[in-house]
């Protein structure tokens, strides 16, 4: 399909720079294909679910993956920013460098140069490989838990480019850009649909008998990469590591067997479950890298309802929601959201999407 079919105009003022407070006070647009749109708020979610339904959350935890460093070449010093996006070993990470052209393979970058990164000293890495789009493989002097500690001390919250270009990260972001149930460290971007959940909302869902299950997909910085191809067939999707354990797969299969709905909280949960689903829709234990790319025409196997934020024009995620609820339905929904002042992107409002064929 032509990528320009997924384009739309978004006024700059619709981009949220801070989240709603409290989290579950964010607005939520309910989209049922063929039915009128409903303007709600996130804490209304329980009224759209039934006893025995199951919410699936991504429990990945965001690490402070944006590192500022310097590259020395004789008397010349260049400022380099690295955004870690996938761990490649105990002492190495794949990262996007900016500006990548100022660093050659074999050169070293010193991070945390304005102070010690951990009790052992500063955080240094060697550029072992360079790839496309500014990607590089960094091999650090530290390894394992010591490297993790150094990154935590030297790193910044990896806010998305559309926020970071307007303001610096601060201490508030360390809490705001993390779900309340995050536990598996490794993401460099938040699974943002989950940011709306609060203990009170969990209690309300428990009261009506909605199940909660957790999977892990470490969201990479590639989620923000633009689609440069003119046709979706030519786009190369980034890979992310995820896992669905056997107990979770069995529990979700049981939900389906008794007629319950499976609700993915976020596109990361959806992409992971679709990767783990057999053609019949049966879920199995699964782990590994997924580069699943969902566009209109895809037949969903594992998910009935999707809760997700509002996405960028021409993005793979807007393509995904268009596949889920229909392209024309989503264009109409986004037009309504823009007209009604909904807040977009990672810190923005939410939508509750019903599948086109349900």
Curated annotation (Swiss-Prot):
It catalyses: 7-aminomethyl-7-carbaguanosine(34) in tRNA + S-adenosyl-L-methionine = epoxyqueuosine(34) in tRNA + adenine + L-methionine + 2 H(+). One of its GO terms (cellular component) is cytoplasm. It holds the Pfam family Queuosine_synth. One of its GO terms (molecular function) is S-adenosylmethionine:tRNA ribosyltransferase-isomerase activity. One of its GO terms (biological process) is tRNA wobble guanine modification. Keywords: Cytoplasm, Queuosine biosynthesis, S-adenosyl-L-methionine, Transferase. It is found in: Cytoplasm. Its main location: cytoplasm. Pathway: tRNA modification; tRNA-queuosine biosynthesis. Its EC number is 2.4.99.17. Transfers and isomerizes the ribose moiety from AdoMet to the 7-aminomethyl group of 7-deazaguanine (preQ1-tRNA) to give epoxyqueuosine (oQ-tRNA). Monomer. Belongs to the QueA family. HAMAP family: QueA (MF_00113). This is S-adenosylmethionine:tRNA ribosyltransferase-isomerase. It comes from Chelativorans sp. (strain BNC1). The gene is queA.
